[in-house]
Amino acid sequence: MFDRRPAAFVTYHAFLFNASYLGDKSIEIQVNPEFETVEAARVEALRFAPVIGRLPNVLLKEVETVWIHKGNNPFGGGNNNLLIHTEQADDYISDGILEETLVHEASHTSLDADHAESEGWIAAQNADPDFISTYARDNPTREDIAETFLVWLAVRHRPDRISDSLKQTIEATNPNRLAYFDEQDFDFFPILIPEKTPKLKEFNLNLNRLDFYLKWESRFASLYDVESSINLEDWSVLEGGIPSQGDITETSDELPTGFDRIFFRIKEKR
């Protein structure tokens, strides 16, 4: 385990806990024996495991272990790991930036190797007016990905948590870096739940009555929209928020008129 206090890798007989997350992700949490008892170590593991689990899958894909020590020392990323010092964590929690810090460190662990020196990223760096922070500017290869990913996440997926002026500043400062991240098709579960395509079981179209009937496989407690299009590009909702009726859901409605062809699709909302 790397420990920032001696600034070295140290062999500890650590307390080990397994954190399992949706999507078959499992992370081993290794807690320094200085916490003395398995109960005290478990408290620390349970303190951080849920927060780590709220990170998007893209940031956890290379995380295999978490190291937890006492001490007021910076967190760390890399080595297929997240490094936590608990007194520093207390400060991050007081400042309201624990999750933001873990996003930064997990970016090192899961993104740096594939992106920090890629042609696309370097081209985006060169095309943008400036770096998003002095830390990124002073460490363009080591810190720019982690610094920029955090603000990209805020702008694209949590804009309600930043001011309009800050959002505009980020977009003006790093438009090409933001576009680079946009193009990556990152797995953002659980921040974004992937759209599910229901399996159609039956479809009937009655041109005499000008109505249609749809039946599809559904999931308990989900909601569904039935949409229509005349060109497979522009879609409009025919029926919205249809509650699941169990394993199978069905609906019928009048056909839109005035078209020589029409397409339907069913979308799960939640």
Give residue ranges: language-model regions.
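A structural motif
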Residues: 75-79, 109-124
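Short pre-active-site segment immediately N-terminal to the catalytic Zn-binding motif
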Residues: 84-101
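Metalloprotease/metallohydrolase-associated module, dominated by Zn2+-dependent proteases
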Residues: 123-195
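Short, composition-biased motifs enriched in small/polar/acidic residues
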Residues: 194-270
